[in-house]
Amino acid sequence: MANPYFQFKKFTVWHDKCAMKVGTDGVLLGAWASTERCQRILDVGTGTGLIALMLAQRSTAILDAIDIDSDACLQAQENIAKSPFANRIQVYQTSLSEYMPDENIKYDLIVSNPPYFIDSLKCPDTKRNLARHTDTLSLPDLLRDSRKLLAPEGNIALVLPFEQRESLIDIAREESLSPSREAHVSPIPDAPPKRLLIELSATPVAKPKSSHLTLEIERHRYSEEFTAIAKDFYLKM
């Protein structure tokens, strides 16, 4: 039986009630997204609350976390309540399109590990389908609705399959967003990138920063660059 929780250095993430479990994608985004000068952060599709918790650990920002699924929201609330960051994170059950923050709040950073199974066959688990498939949150909808909530100097940070890079940039351009920073993530040395970490900005950047990130140099041996961003979270680093 899979472990119902994942223990990090400063908090524990239970995922027994949530369709999508703790995984490398969420850890990557939570460790990589820039929190510099961030006062307000929005986590879209929070699931267990993992990314919100990681960003709270890395910043002094106030965070709002939203999810359309009631069980995910309950799980996130429980995980956050038991963490040292409970006073800075609020969870709301809502879709992004219907989310209306108080007092016309604008966010310095909006993060999402969005659904990305576009054409694949669906599994019998309805809640897992909701979390994995783009029926409920397409990239055009995600960027359009996030853009409305973004501060003028803010960023949108995402983790996606690498093959979606070109289509994402095209969609972003339609919303007057452009890449400011990205990392191409490979599982092992010399393997093609499997994941894309990308920050989109409403302010054009003359020379976007691009890097390559390898997760493991061999089985169960993390690379130096992944260790550098994840060591404050993983117990065995």
Swiss-Prot record:
InterPro entries: DNA_methylase_N6_adenine_CS (IPR002052), SAM-dependent_MTases_sf (IPR029063), Small_mtfrase_dom (IPR007848), tRNA_Adenine-N(6)_MTase (IPR050210), tRNA_adenine-N6_MeTrfase (IPR022882)
EC number: 2.1.1.223
Pfam families (alphabetical): MTS
GO terms for MF: nucleic acid binding; tRNA (adenine-N6)-methyltransferase activity
Keywords from the named record: Cytoplasm, Methyltransferase, S-adenosyl-L-methionine, Transferase, tRNA processing
Protein origin, superkingdom: Bacteria
Cellular component annotations (GO), alphabetically ordered: cytoplasm
Entries under PROSITE patterns matching the protein: N6_MTASE
Keyword tRNA processing: yes
Biological processes, Gene Ontology terms: methylation; tRNA processing
UniProt subcellular location: Cytoplasm
Catalytic activity reported: adenosine(37) in tRNA1(Val) + S-adenosyl-L-methionine = N(6)-methyladenosine(37) in tRNA1(Val) + S-adenosyl-L-homocysteine + H(+)
PANTHER family associated with the record: TRNA1(VAL) (ADENINE(37)-N6)-METHYLTRANSFERASE
Family, as annotated: Belongs to the methyltransferase superfamily. tRNA (adenine-N(6)-)-methyltransferase family.
The protein's role, per its UniProt record: Specifically methylates the adenine in position 37 of tRNA(1)(Val) (anticodon cmo5UAC).
Name this polypeptide is given: tRNA1(Val) (adenine(37)-N6)-methyltransferase
Protein's organism: Parabacteroides distasonis (strain ATCC 8503 / DSM 20701 / CIP 104284 / JCM 5825 / NCTC 11152)
Lineage: Bacteria, Pseudomonadati, Bacteroidota, Bacteroidia, Bacteroidales
